[in-house]
């Protein structure tokens, strides 16, 4: 079995960032399949590498989390063009697996299906174009309708669809009746991230001795709504709680958030540069609560953020400020707290019991790890993913 994976933002454990597509590719390789990934990088020349049995082709297509909507769109289309040029090398492959976002990767998958008769499976991590429309990046009615037509066309011509959350699965099933939609959420790497005692050396390096640590690890963009995270840090400062906050990542709003934090005199907040998963592991070692934050836009509640699953695997108290399926999950499993996004003082109210009751904190943290092992372990979901390709074409 030969599988061609299209993912513009493919990362490895060494490079850092979201590595779901690496996990998926590795699962297929471990199942005895040949796997080729077409991705992109910011270097000026095309490059080919073999990474743990995965053949990776890097197209020269610049992309940065700080890009605006137009620059991102141009990058997405340039990637599609590059895939089409390269795809002829793999015309004897059995399946194409196209990973969005962006939605436009579906154009490349459709072209490969039409030209080489290779069926494709389409992965949906965020509902496009709903997300950019609800966030008002796309305001033109006719452009919006064109994007919706493209979305439906991509789903309809796919062999099947993989959804990263129950909410996304439900939405696609409504949009394209009768289409097979698999549910393969993001994965908790329970072998790499584990509950562990805080390392005094790391506590000293991060300067958080005797502190309750709340960490946000991930993209720092408009969708992440991190103004609320700063408001929580400010509310904790005013309440004189022994908390320290971290924002670890990169994105369009980093500089503005740093400026705002300085204006608020948030000595209890530290910004850390984007890092690979070894760096994330070190930060999680000293972390008590893992914070997942979103701007208050309904469609964002359907997502499947990596940081949530890393926090579960590491056995951390989960803190969120949005509703939807993740809110239901943490409340049903008693492993996290939901904080009112309009009231930062609600965070102070709900986090305070965990500062004074170690048994309560330990119970919630253990429940996080249990949920990761029971429902979201990389081993379990990798097997479910590989099984998709054993079905007849």
Go through each PLM region and give its residues:
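N-terminal subdomain of nucleotide-sugar transferases
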Residues: 1-60, 236
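Nucleotide-activated donor-binding/catalytic signature segment of Leloir-type glycosyltransferases, i.e.
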Residues: 248, 255-281
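Nucleotide-sugar-dependent
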Residues: 224, 276-283, 288-313, 319-328
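Membrane-proximal helix-turn-helix segments that form the acceptor-binding/catalytic region
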Residues: 84, 104-107, 111-115, 141-163
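Carbohydrate-associated surface elements
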Residues: 41, 167, 184-187
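Acidic anion/phosphate-binding donor-loop and adjacent secondary structure
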Residues: 188-204, 225, 391
């Amino acid at each position: 079995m030969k599988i061609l994976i299209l993912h513009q933002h493919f990362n490895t454990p060494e490079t850092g960032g979201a590595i779901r597509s690496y996990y998926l590719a590795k699962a297929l390789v471990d199942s005895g399949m040949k796997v080729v990934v077409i991705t992109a990088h910011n270097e000026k020349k095309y490059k080919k590498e073999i990474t743990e049995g995965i053949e990776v082709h890097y197209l020269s297509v610049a992309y940065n989390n700080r890009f605006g909507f137009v620059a991102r769109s141009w990058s997405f289309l340039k990637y599609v063009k590059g895939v089409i040029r390269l795809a002829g090398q793999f015309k004897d492959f059995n399946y194409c697996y196209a990973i969005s976002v962006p939605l436009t990767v579906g154009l490349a998958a459709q072209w490969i299906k039409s030209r080489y008769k290779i069926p494709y499976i389409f992965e949906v991590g965020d509902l496009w174009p709903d997300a950019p429309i609800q966030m008002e990046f796309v305001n033109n009615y006719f452009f919006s309708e064109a994007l919706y037509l493209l979305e439906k066309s991509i789903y309809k011509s796919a062999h099947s669809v993989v959804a990263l959350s129950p909410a996304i699965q439900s939405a696609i099933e409504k949009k394209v009746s009768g289409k097979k939609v698999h549910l393969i959420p993001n994965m908790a790497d329970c072998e790499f991230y584990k509950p562990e005692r805080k390392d005094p050396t790391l506590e000293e390096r991060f300067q958080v001795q005797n502190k309750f640590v709340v960490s946000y690890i991930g993209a720092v963009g408009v969708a992440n709504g991190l103004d609320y995270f700063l408001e929580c840090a400010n509310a904790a400062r005013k309440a004189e709680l022994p908390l320290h906050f971290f924002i670890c990542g990169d994105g369009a709003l980093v500089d503005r958030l740093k400026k705002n934090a300085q204006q608020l005199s948030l000595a209890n907040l530290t910004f850390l540069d984007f890092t690979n998963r070894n760096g994330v592991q070190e930060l999680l070692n000293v972390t008590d609560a893992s914070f997942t934050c979103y701007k208050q836009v309904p469609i964002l509640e359907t997502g499947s953020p990596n940081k949530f699953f890393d926090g579960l695997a590491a056995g951390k108290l989960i803190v969120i400020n949005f509703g939807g399926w993740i809110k239901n999950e943490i409340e049903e499993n008693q492993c996290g707290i939901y904080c009112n996004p309009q009231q930062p003082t609600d965070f102070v109210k709900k986090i305070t019991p965990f500062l004074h009751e170690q048994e309560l904190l330990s119970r919630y943290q253990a429940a996080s790890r249990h949920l990761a092992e029971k429902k979201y372990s990389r081993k379990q979901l990798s097997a479910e993913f590989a099984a998709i390709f054993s079905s007849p074409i």
